[in-house]
Amino acid sequence: MNEADGRFAGDRGCGDIHEPMVSEPAGRTVRGLLFGSVAECYERYRLDYPNELVDIVLRYAGRPVRTALEVGAGTGKATRLFASRGIEVTALEPDADMAHVLDRATRGLPVRPVVSTFEEFRIESRFDLVYAAAAWHWTSPVTRWARAVELLVPGGVLVLFGRPAELKDPDLFAAVEEIEKRVLLGDDPVEVHPWSIEEMAAADGLADVEQRDLPYVATTTAEEFVGRLATVSAYLKLSPDQRAGALRQVRAILPDQVDIDATVQLSLARRVDQSVS
């Protein structure tokens, strides 16, 4: 890490980290739109998803999946997996900087990046699959389930997944958690909307809800782990000096290599087929 500016030397390859400037008219920072300030680092440090994830989704679907809508595509970590199977993906990403990296990372694949939120996306057709990779908590809890159903063909599949990417060692996990309790700001309920499998199961128009885990432990360097933390919204809400100080504190307590719990957690549901036979 460069002590002068709080950045890792390796971050030079991520491009400039600029201050988030996304605000609503009232001035409240839109936390879900902070990631563009670190788009290149997001692509570099966020973990990729395993191919097995797509296998699980396709088996669950039980029928051809030709089209998909991705909610909050980011830089295309999950987009590339599905598109590489020949699925035509409409990838929604509300942040223009993230969408720029997404477009570059998916060239040559059947991907149509769209700069839009899930709520504002204009419905032109229905999809065989709607999915979100670590992004569903940015959607509106009032409309998201009904909108997902509206966007799916009868019998189509909704898949929500993510991975914790947390330190496997309980002592290190607790030590980092203690630092974060001191320096990070709490979640704003106006910005972050957690969801549960119970909500998914209770949503009108969805059935056959299942949960699957893909256990995986990744070994990474401390610098890569801290680089990933620098792309987390809770850190991006801090001022540059606060963020650099927090990351220095975390790096100081880590060994050179760490094991990460990178288990992929999936929730799957099917739109009820209301067609008349």
Question: What are these regions, as identified by a protein language model?
Answer:
Residues 139-148:
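A short, conserved alpha-helix within the catalytic core of class I
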Residues 147-216:
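Conserved catalytic/acceptor-binding region of the Class I
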Residues 197-277:
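Conserved Class I S-adenosyl-L-methionine
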